[in-house]
């Protein structure tokens, strides 16, 4: 975890995401000032913090000194002395544009402002900002206090200095910032999730599988690998000693088969090499058999954790087959 000069964070919006940010910041000893026009927001956030705290403590994610949580009446009061601003209002573009216009009028000029938007373009949110160069997307995943990914997305107006400052701050919170290289709607992770979701809807609509069976297909197979390897490294290791090159040669032609409802890109030689090279860089100097051992240990430990903390007693969480009903 890196150090940060940010000591006071303003949160605009206190729903699931805003409350999650508050919890993570408090666990890292920061002062948090939150504003939300809803009268129930304060109780909601305080309850989220209290409920999450034992889990964070058991996981060793709480600093020695718990941060302080304050509630402000409006945006101006919340952001005026903040070192960092994270906006978490509902995903409506015009609302966010208006909120960021107000934030930019009251926050210090040197303060980075991030939006938790899950799909909007930062260039659109900058439309009425006094200092658009400091505004970007900082898209987390719920529960924010546990999941480390945060996608940082800037526009042509966003300064690289501001992006670097945001990345350093998120790292100081124990998160894993991912800088999206180009401004694009829905960024990276949600696009991947959406692709899987669309295909799952097709399978349900065609009567191929139930919701539980589709979830089981993910959690019992690729999902366990994805938790620590991702898509490409899993395929790289699945190709045996030949790695991704062997996987592409063996399964590449299957991309042309009409199995899914998403059109795949043409698998050109250039694209093949980019994928292979990327996998080899990611796996680094680790030997193939070493990676296999590490993968197997991770898979075993993940399943132990799921069995102990997720599934009900005497159940394994797997849906019954049709012949068992």
What are these regions (language model features)?
Residues 1-55:
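NAD(P)+-binding Rossmann beta1-loop-alpha1 motif at the extreme N-terminus of oxidoreductases
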Residues 2-5, 28, 175, 206, ...:
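NAD(P)-dependent Rossmann-like dehydrogenase/reductase catalytic/cofactor-binding core
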Residues 32, 85, 113-114, 135:
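Hydrophobic/aromatic residues located in beta-strands of well-ordered beta-sheets
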Residues 37-40, 55-112:
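Rossmann-like NAD(P)-binding element
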Residues 38, 131, 159, 209-213:
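Helix N-cap / loop-to-helix initiation motif
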Residues 115-182, 186, 190:
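Rossmann-fold dinucleotide-binding core
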Residues 144-153, 173, 178-208, 216-233, ...:
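Active-site-proximal catalytic alpha-helix in oxidoreductases
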């Amino acid at each position: 975890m890196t150090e940060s000069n940010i000591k006071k964070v303003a949160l605009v919006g206190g729903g699931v995401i805003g409350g999650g940010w508050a919890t993570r910041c408090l666990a890292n000893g920061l002062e948090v000032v939150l504003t939300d026009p809803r009268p129930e927001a304060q109780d909601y956030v305080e309850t989220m913090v209290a409920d999450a705290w034992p889990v964070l403590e058991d996981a060793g994610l709480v600093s020695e000194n718990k941060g302080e949580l304050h509630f402000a009446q409006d945006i101006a009061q919340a952001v005026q002395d903040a070192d960092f601003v994270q906006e978490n209002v509902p995903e409506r573009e015009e609302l966010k544009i208006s909120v960021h216009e107000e934030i930019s009028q009251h926050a210090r000029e040197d303060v980075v402002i991030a939006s938790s938007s899950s799909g909007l373009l930062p260039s659109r949110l900058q439309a009425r900002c006094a200092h658009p160069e400091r505004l970007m997307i900082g898209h987390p995943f719920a529960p924010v206090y546990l999941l480390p990914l945060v996608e940082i997305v800037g526009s042509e107006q966003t300064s690289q200095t501001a992006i670097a400052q945001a990345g350093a701050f998120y790292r100081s919170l124990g998160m894993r910032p991912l800088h999206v290289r180009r401004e694009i709607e829905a960024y990276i992770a949600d696009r991947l999730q959406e692709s899987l979701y669309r295909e799952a809807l097709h399978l349900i609509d065609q009567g191929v599988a139930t919701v539980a069976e589709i979830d089981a297909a993910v959690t019992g197979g690729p999902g366990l690998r994805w938790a620590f390897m991702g898509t490409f490294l899993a395929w790289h290791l699945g190709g045996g000693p030949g790695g991704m090159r062997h996987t592409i040669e063996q399964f590449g032609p299957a991309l042309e088969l009409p199995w899914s409802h998403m059109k795949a890109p043409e698998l050109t030689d250039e694209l093949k090499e980019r994928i292979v090279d990327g996998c080899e860089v990611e796996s680094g100097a680790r030997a193939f058999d070493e990676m296999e051992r590490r993968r197997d240990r991770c898979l075993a430990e993940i399943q132990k954790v799921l069995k102990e903390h997720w599934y009900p007693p005497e159940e394994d969480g797997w849906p019954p087959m049709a012949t068992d009903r």
